[in-house]
Curated annotation (Swiss-Prot):
InterPro entries: Aldolase_TIM, DHquinase_I, Type-I_3-dehydroquinase. This is 3-dehydroquinate dehydratase. CDD domains: DHQase_I (cd00502). One of its GO terms (molecular function) is 3-dehydroquinate dehydratase activity. It catalyses: 3-dehydroquinate = 3-dehydroshikimate + H2O. The gene is aroD. GO terms for biological process: 3,4-dihydroxybenzoate biosynthetic process; amino acid biosynthetic process; aromatic amino acid family biosynthetic process; chorismate biosynthetic process. It comes from the Bacteria. Pathway: Metabolic intermediate biosynthesis; chorismate biosynthesis; chorismate from D-erythrose 4-phosphate and phosphoenolpyruvate: step 3/7. NCBIfam families: aroD. Homodimer.
Amino acid sequence: MATVKVRDVVFGAGAPKICVPMVGRTLDQLVNETEVLKVLDFDLAEWRVDFFEHVEDIEEVKSALFEIRARLGEKPLLFTFRSKREGGQREVSDDYYGALNKALAQTGEIDLVDVELFQEQSVVRELVDTAHEHGVKVVMSSHDFARTPVKEEILMRLCRMQELGADLPKIAVMPQNASDVLVLLDATNTMREHFADRPFITMSMSGLGGVTRLAGEVFGSALTFGSAVEASAPGQINAADLRNILNLLHMQT
């Protein structure tokens, strides 16, 4: 399987990389979050722009991005607008979703962009092309906050993301019981052994799925999310604790 390098971070080699989301609603809150990140051990930051109060003004988003980028130094930055139907804070039109992500990919200030698999397919294809034209990696994602699909469905979505040009396919699902967590882990292992030609990301959410955020090196997931100020999804573990646990598990593998 190939690796994916973003700045100095290599996905698909060694322990899962740690991504810390920034979820500030105002620019001041975002600036405060970047100050907290300065003392954390993590690999990349994610700006969850759907939390931002001015998210429907592209110029305001760009202005905030320039401030964030300047404060993050050489840490890679993932830009994410999470739609409400996939667990985010708000819904926008397909046209605006495409325009926002395209405009930010063209700034040269982000390293990765999240593209939801189930957005309008013409929008998905255009965003993948635009991102790659500007040297931006694509995290293509699917989130199910209601259930855990069957193993075959999880594999189908991840393989479809590869076909569409995702650099890092990603799926997050909600478990109802321990068996659901095992379904996600089994799918992850099967993806790694039989279908993946690039790093990918999987997780089972909530406290019940917490083990999947820790076991990526064993089963095949290349990235995990840890919280700093506020979690962006159920089950996220504090980033400092996450690093300690991942390091311990890495020494045993």
